[in-house]
């Protein structure tokens, strides 16, 4: 599973449908590289390259904006189901302590807004994924549908129709994740498995809408904005490279209230996204979705 979202995974037998990419100097932004940069860690100002980490990740002033962070809730769900050393969580998420252990220095003066101390490893571009001739070129294909998604969709259908084969399909995913099998699986089992297996793959929102869970799960989403704070401990030597890479830190998370109207969940509006205004102007037959 470590090859997913990397060039090594291009054409994988687990990619049922994928968005392919190729080197095209005339369309670097359009082919998706820009979005990889937006979702990259804040390399360049938040993190500092070490002697080993620089051979795996791209560090420069414009290589990452640190969008798209895993939440504390997601990390804790992984740990509760498979432990801190679970196959999936250790492949797809890093804690701050683990980031420090990756031979990456920390710029403690940089704020990490929108972060609770957990960092996405899934879909994090490596040097092998980058087209080195241009800073945002990315040649790793994006899986639109993975085989695990298909198995879990089949399991969900079986649960809804009281078909005992639901166990078979769900356990195929759990077996690959190095977890014990379950029997007589329920919708709660299915919901958890989809959350963990397909985390950060842009299917969670649609799942919550389909299940009718969005008004509860997303009721307070975005109302409090996290800021991950890092303070070097006394005695650190931050004047040398060795000192930076071996520094120790105290960490905390603060939250600020977000009073924007769009924060949280508004019934009969948030189930759908708005049509872009220019699309409505071009086509008067389009009626804007409710609430916008």
What are these regions (language model features)?
Residues 45, 51-55, 164-171:
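Short, compositionally biased low-complexity segments
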Residues 62-64:
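Glycine/tryptophan-enriched, flexible segments
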Residues 17, 83-91, 141-173, 187-199, ...:
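Extended, hydrophobic/aromatic-rich amphipathic alpha-helical segments that build helical scaffolds
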Residues 14, 69-146, 291-292:
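Flexible, polar/acidic helix-loop-strand segments at domain edges
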Residues 3-49, 53, 137, 182-292:
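Long, intrinsically disordered, low-complexity segments
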Residues 46, 52, 56, 66-69, ...:
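Noncatalytic, helix-rich "gating/capping" subdomain that lines the substrate-entry/channel surface
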Residues 1-8, 72-77:
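Short alpha-helical segments and helix-capping/turn motifs at coil-helix boundaries
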């Amino acid at each position: 599973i470590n090859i997913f979202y990397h060039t090594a995974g291009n054409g994988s037998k687990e990619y049922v449908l994928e968005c392919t990419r190729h080197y095209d100097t005339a369309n670097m932004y359009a082919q998706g590289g820009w979005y990889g940069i937006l979702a990259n860690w804040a390399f360049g100002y938040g993190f500092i390259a070490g002697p080993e980490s620089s051979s795996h990740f791209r560090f420069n002033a414009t290589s990452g904006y640190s969008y798209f962070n895993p939440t504390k809730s997601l990390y804790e769900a992984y740990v509760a189901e498979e432990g801190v050393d679970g196959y999936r969580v250790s492949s797809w998420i890093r804690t701050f302590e683990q980031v420090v252990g990756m031979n990456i220095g920390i710029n403690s003066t940089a704020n990490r807004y929108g972060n609770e101390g957990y960092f996405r490893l899934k879909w994090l571009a490596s040097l092998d994924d980058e087209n080195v001739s241009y800073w945002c070129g990315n040649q790793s294909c994006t899986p639109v549908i993975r085989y695990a998604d298909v198995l879990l969709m089949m399991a969900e259908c079986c649960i809804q129709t009281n078909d005992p084969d639901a166990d078979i399909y769900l356990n195929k995913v759990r077996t690959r994740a190095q977890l014990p099998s379950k029997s007589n699986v329920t919708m709660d089992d299915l919901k958890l498995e989809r959350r963990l297996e397909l985390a950060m793959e842009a299917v969670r929102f649609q799942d919550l809408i389909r299940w009718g869970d969005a008004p509860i799960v997303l009721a307070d989403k975005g109302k409090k904005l996290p800021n991950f704070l890092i303070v070097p401990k006394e005695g650190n030597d931050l004047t040398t490279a060795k000192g930076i890479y071996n520094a120790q830190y105290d960490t905390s998370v603060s939250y600020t209230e977000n009073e924007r109207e769009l924060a949280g969940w508004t019934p009969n509006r948030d189930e759908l996204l708005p049509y872009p205004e220019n699309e409505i102007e071009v086509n008067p037959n389009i009626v804007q979705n409710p609430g916008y």
